[in-house]
């Protein structure tokens, strides 16, 4: 489902002494089946923005269009139930979303809540657990017995159990070690590529953004500053420096080499893959020179 924000403002506690405008004239487009990252400093409006995607928040003005549904300030809660099945939300530290006595019961909760029979929910729980790389042995275990990485997988399985078209993730790898982060991000990318799930990632890890996102929305003080490819965002040092956005370590290394005369012949590499491709071209050119 395509996502459109048109002139969206959001105000917390309007018409009170504590009124605060969190989003200002937000216009953006997220293509169906794409992998979009949302970045920005703390307080830039990231969390407020993603809460509009399943109607947890409604625009103070403007509209959010998701598929055929248009969300405005006047939309009724009864009109949002189908949307909330189609848009899965995984918040920061998703293990805090685990509440049932067993992994199976936790994953079954969503499908049953949306009207699925207990028998079918059991089948869905097994399928969802398999998708996140865990076997049936985990079904009868307490979520509290699991490691941090396993808890993240179970929480993700619970969201996937309702078969969302859109998956919104708020810092899904926060607190995990390097291996755990890689496993979770590869799993999320796999969902996008194999099941055509639209992925919307909020992250402070610019490495994750550079490695996995196809496009980036940069927010500052509730406004969209730029929407572009990761390469265009991270190669624009004027914007990243002004807004205090860290660049990926690969780009930092590339900038260091650029200052010392290395010609990258175009945009700077932003991740390990693009840097390795650059090195490969250099070696191929040297081989040709030797042959000549």
Curated annotation (Swiss-Prot):
EC number(s) stated in the UniProt entry for this protein: 7.-.-.-
Gene3D superfamilies according to UniProt: P-loop containing nucleotide triphosphate hydrolases (3.40.50.300)
GO molecular function: ATP binding; ATP hydrolysis activity; ATPase-coupled transmembrane transporter activity
Main location per the UniProt record: membrane
InterPro entries, sorted: AAA+_ATPase (IPR003593), ABC_transporter-like_ATP-bd (IPR003439), ABC_transporter-like_CS (IPR017871), ABC_transpr_CbiO/EcfA_su (IPR015856), ECF_ABC_transporter_ATP-bd (IPR050095), EcfA2 (IPR030946), P-loop_NTPase (IPR027417)
Organism domain of life: Bacteria
Residues bound to ATP: 40-47
ABC transporter domain segment(s): 3-246
Purpose: ATP-binding (A) component of a common energy-coupling factor (ECF) ABC-transporter complex. Unlike classic ABC transporters this ECF transporter provides the energy necessary to transport a number of different substrates.
Family label: Belongs to the ABC transporter superfamily. Energy-coupling factor EcfA family.
Name the record gives this protein: Energy-coupling factor transporter ATP-binding protein EcfA2
Taxonomic lineage of the native organism: Bacteria, Bacillati, Bacillota, Bacilli, Lactobacillales
Gene label: ecfA2
């Amino acid at each position: 489902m395509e996502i459109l924000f048109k002139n969206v403002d959001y105000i917390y506690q309007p018409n009170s002494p504590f009124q605060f405008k969190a989003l200002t004239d937000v216009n953006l487009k997220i293509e169906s089946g794409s992998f979009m990252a949302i970045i920005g400093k703390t307080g830039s409006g990231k969390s407020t923005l993603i809460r509009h995607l399943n109607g947890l928040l409604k625009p103070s003005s403007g509209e959010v269009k998701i598929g055929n549904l248009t969300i405005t300030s006047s939309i009724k809660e009864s009109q949002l139930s189908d949307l909330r099945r189609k848009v899965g939300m995984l918040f920061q530290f998703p293990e805090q979303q685990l509440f049932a006595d067993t992994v199976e019961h936790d994953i079954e909760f969503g499908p049953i809540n949306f009207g699925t029979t207990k028998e079918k929910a059991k089948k869905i729980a097994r399928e969802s657990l398999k998708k996140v790389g865990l076997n049936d042995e985990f079904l009868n275990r307490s979520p509290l017995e699991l490691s941090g990485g396993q808890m993240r997988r179970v929480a993700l399985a619970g969201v996937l159990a309702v078969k969302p078209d859109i998956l919104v993730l708020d810092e899904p790898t926060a607190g995990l070690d390097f291996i755990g982060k890689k496993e979770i991000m590869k799993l999320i990318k796999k969902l996008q590529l194999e099941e055509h799930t639209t992925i919307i990632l909020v992250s402070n890890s610019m490495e994750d953004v550079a490695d996995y996102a196809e496009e980036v929305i940069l927010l500052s003080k509730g406004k969209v500053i730029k929407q572009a490819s990761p390469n265009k965002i991270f190669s624009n040092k004027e914007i990243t420096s002004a807004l205090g956005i860290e660049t990926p370590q690969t780009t930092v290394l590339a900038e260091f080499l650029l200052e010392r005369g290395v010609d990258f012949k175009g945009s700077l590499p932003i991740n390990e893959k693009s840097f390795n491709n650059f090195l490969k071209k250099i070696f191929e050119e040297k081989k040709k020179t030797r042959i000549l």
